[in-house]
Each structure stands twice: as structure tokens, then as C-alpha cells.
């Protein structure tokens, strides 16, 4: 898989930004349900599910629809790897995703709620992402009968989403805080203020490559602007702590950190078999070394490699190499 091949897999909003070494991406997600339809988790029939898909498609004709029942498993999991759909959407019998041209907008149909509107970007621009998601929300609201209560707000399947129905989240690369074992303390602290830390694919997912998703937990009684402002403040505090820890590692643990970086670089350069878990760890430590200016690598794309080394992009019926072997081959080709 060449560097051009990797870039072809990526949505534009997922690409690396040199000016943002810690913030990988941001997302605004709005949960909505439709009146006169059974909720997806309450035995939604395939017939009703496909009827909802058609209604949403008619309301948003400018977006491309992909029905998951028409896709093979590998194609579905590629969408998961690119953060365009959730693993939960795959498990629904009648589900779909609508995407705009650059894939910065994704509308999941018949996941936990009838609609999950997602706007995504590769910086900390939560307010502009909310405006983007809100524009789609307004279009749907003008065409469809969306469930809304004057007292409670938007009615959702999960009680924690009732109110604005909004989840704001930011993906951060936090190797310093992880190495110094600070993440549990941070998780406990922000939890008291209504925020949570999850893995790379949200609730219940594993942490790979020292990448964490920070998001709000509750929406009832808060405005969208309140949630965005509070999350932005929390994220900035975490970024500041990560920068302080990196400075400490550089000053007081220089040799140990340098050794960690070069060991990982050597494994990526020379391994012939490597698992997803180890590959993401080694990529993270090499990225830390680049950020601390210990090493220079030409055209090192952390975000893109973290997607490209996932199994859905490595499976090929015409190639008898194992996934771990192909992953190692890709990394050797790109780490120079």
C-alpha cells in the first residue's frame, strides 16, 4: 500500500495538521427520532426501517446514501475505521448512512436513534461543526416530524441524550499523560463536571495509540453553546497538562523517553509481524519523538497510518499474507 493509496482511503477532515499535534479531530453529533415510528432498539421491523431510510433520503437529496444491507462486511468496517459510522449501526437489520462529498457530514439512520447527525473536522472548531450539523437538523425538521417535547427537549432512546440530544467530542493524542499514568485521575476529575473519556471508537471501545475521546455525558438542562464552551475549556486544560508532561519528560526523563522513541522506531522499521495494538503504540511513541523534535521523519502521517493499519483495509482474498504481516509491510514502507 503506497502513500498515495493511504491518502485515498482518508476523508479530508481526518488528515494530519502539523499545527495541531495533540488535537486529532472534533465531532458534533445530534440524536433525533421521528414520530409515528418504532425506535430502532424496540424491535424496529425491516420494512419500517427501510421506510425511514427513504424518508430521510427524500429530505436530504444532496447527500449520497449507502444502505448497509447492500454492503459486504469489509466495506462496513472500513466506514467504522474512518469514524463515519458506529459499530452499533452494523448490527441493525435496516440501516444506512448518508454522506456529503468530503465525508465531513455523516447521518446514520436507524442506529440507537432514528437519526445520528455527525459533523466532523480535524481541529477544535466545535462551534462551526455545530452550525454545520444544525443546518442539516433544520432541513430534516422542516421535512420530517421529529420527536420533541416542550419541557424535555428532543426525545432520544438513551435518557442521557434527552434535551439537546447533542454529543460534542474531541479526539486527543495523549502519550505523555498515559506514560506518566495520569489518565485515571483526569477521567475521575472531568467526570465530576459531566464529561467522560472513552476509547477511539467511543463508549466501550479500546484505547489504541494513546488516543482518547473526550465528550459530554449529559444534555438535559444545558444549551448547545454551554456544552461546547465547557468541553472546549476541559479539552484545553487537558492539552495544557499534556504539554507540561511532555516538557517534564524532556527535561527530567530525557534518556528514557529518547530510548522509548527509538525502540519504537526500530520495531516499526524492521518488524515482519505486528499486531494492531502494538503498531498503534509504536506509532504513538514515534509521533511523540517527532513532536519533541528528537527525530525527523519525512511525511510521517500519524492519523492516516492509524486508519490504514486497521484490519478492514488489509483484508484481501487474493493476498495470502496474514493481517499482521501486511500491517508490518505497510509500516516498513512508510517509516523512513
Curated annotation (Swiss-Prot):
UniProt-listed PROSITE patterns: PHOSPHAGEN_KINASE, PHOSPHAGEN_KINASE_C
Organism: Staphylococcus saprophyticus subsp. saprophyticus (strain ATCC 15305 / DSM 20229 / NCIMB 8711 / NCTC 7292 / S-41)
UniProt keyword Transferase, yes or no: yes
Family annotation (PANTHER family): ARGININE KINASE 1-RELATED, ARGININE OR CREATINE KINASE
UniProt GO MF annotations: ATP binding; creatine kinase activity; protein kinase activity
Taxonomic lineage from the root: Bacteria, Bacillati, Bacillota, Bacilli, Bacillales
InterPro entries: Arg_Kinase, ATP-guanido_PTrfase, ATP-guanido_PTrfase_AS, ATP-guanido_PTrfase_cat, Gln_synth/guanido_kin_cat_dom
Function as written in the Swiss-Prot or TrEMBL entry: Catalyzes the specific phosphorylation of arginine residues in proteins.
Highest taxon of the lineage: Bacteria
One GO term of the biological process aspect: phosphocreatine biosynthetic process
SUPFAM superfamilies: Glutamine synthetase/guanido kinase
Span of domain Phosphagen kinase C-terminal: 22-245
Xref: CDD domains: bacterial_phosphagen_kinase
One GO cellular component, as annotated: extracellular space
NCBIfam families documented for this protein: PRK01059.1-3
Family according to the record: Belongs to the ATP:guanido phosphotransferase family.
Pfam families: ATP-gua_Ptrans
Sequence positions that bind ATP: 25-29, 83, 116, 167-171, 198-203
Record keywords: ATP-binding, Kinase, Nucleotide-binding, Transferase
EC number: 2.7.14.1
Catalytic reaction annotation: L-arginyl-[protein] + ATP = N(omega)-phospho-L-arginyl-[protein] + ADP + H(+)
Name by which UniProt lists this protein: Protein-arginine kinase
Amino acid at each position: 500500500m503506497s502513500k498515495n493509496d493511504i491518502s485515498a482511503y482518508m476523508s479530508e477532515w481526518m488528515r494530519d495538521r502539523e499545527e495541531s499535534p495533540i488535537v486529532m479531530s472534533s465531532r458534533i453529533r445530534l440524536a433525533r427520532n421521528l414520530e409515528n415510528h418504532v425506535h430502532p432498539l424496540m424491535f424496529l421491523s425491516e420494512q419500517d426501517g427501510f421506510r425511514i431510510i427513504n424518508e430521510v433520503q427524500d429530505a436530504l437529496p444532496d447527500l449520497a446514501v449507502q444502505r448497509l444491507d447492500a454492503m459486504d462486511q469489509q466495506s462496513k468496517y472500513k466506514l467504522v475505521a474512518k469514524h463515519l459510522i458506529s459499530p452499533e449501526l452494523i448490527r441493525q437489520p435496516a440501516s444506512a448512512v448518508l454522506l456529503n462529498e468530503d465525508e465531513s457530514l455523516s447521518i446514520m439512520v436507524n442506529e440507537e436513534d432514528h437519526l445520528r447527525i455527525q459533523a466532523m473536522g480535524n481541529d477544535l472548531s466545535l462551534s462551526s461543526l455545530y452550525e454545520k450539523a444544525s443546518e442539516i437538523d433544520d432541513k430534516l425538521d422542516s421535512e420530517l416530524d421529529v420527536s420533541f417535547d416542550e419541557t424535555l427537549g428532543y426525545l432520544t432512546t438513551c435518557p442521557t441524550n434527552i434535551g439537546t440530544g447533542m454529543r460534542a467530542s474531541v479526539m486527543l493524542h495523549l502519550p505523555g499523560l498515559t506514560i506518566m499514568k495520569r489518565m485515571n485521575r483526569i477521567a475521575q476529575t472531568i467526570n465530576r463536571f459531566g464529561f467522560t473519556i472513552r476509547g477511539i471508537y467511543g463508549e466501550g471501545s479500546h484505547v489504541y495509540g494513546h488516543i482518547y475521546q473526550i465528550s459530554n455525558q449529559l444534555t438535559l438542562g444545558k444549551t448547545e453553546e454551554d456544552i461546547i464552551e465547557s468541553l472546549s475549556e476541559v479539552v484545553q486544560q487537558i492539552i495544557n497538562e499534556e504539554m507540561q508532561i511532555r516538557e517534564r519528560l524532556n527535561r527530567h526523563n530525557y534518556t528514557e523517553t529518547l530510548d522509548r522513541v527509538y525502540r519504537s522506531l526500530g520495531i516499526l522499521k524492521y518488524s515482519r509481524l505486528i499486531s494492531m495494538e502494538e503498531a498503534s503504540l509504536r506509532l504513538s511513541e514515534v509521533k511523540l519523538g517527532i513532536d519533541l523534535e528528537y527525530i525527523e521523519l519525512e511525511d510521517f502521517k500519524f492519523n492516516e497510518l492509524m486508519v490504514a493499519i486497521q484490519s478492514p483495509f488489509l483484508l484481501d482474498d487474493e493476498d495470502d499474507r496474514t493481517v499482521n504481516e501486511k500491517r508490518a509491510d505497510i509500516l516498513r514502507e512508510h517509516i523512513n
